Amino acid sequence: MKRTYQPSVTKRKRTHGFLVRSKTRGGRAVLAARRAKGRKRLAV
């Protein structure tokens, strides 16, 4: 049986990347929350 996690940089960026997060209101909320928490990395 194939494992569920098949890494791909392209897919990773397109779904969880900074630009994608910036586009939607919810995504911007995620970035704001991570900034407030003091995360070193805001997005992938």
Curated annotation (Swiss-Prot):
One of its GO terms (biological process) is translation. Residues 34-44 have a biased composition (Basic residues). GO terms for molecular function: structural constituent of ribosome. Gene3D superfamilies: 1.10.287.3980. Pfam families: Ribosomal_L34. One of its GO terms (cellular component) is ribonucleoprotein complex. Disulfide bonds: none annotated. Keywords: Ribonucleoprotein, Ribosomal protein. Signal peptide: none annotated. Residues 24-44 are annotated as: Disordered. InterPro entries: Ribosomal_bL34, Ribosomal_bL34_CS. Belongs to the bacterial ribosomal protein bL34 family. This is Large ribosomal subunit protein bL34.
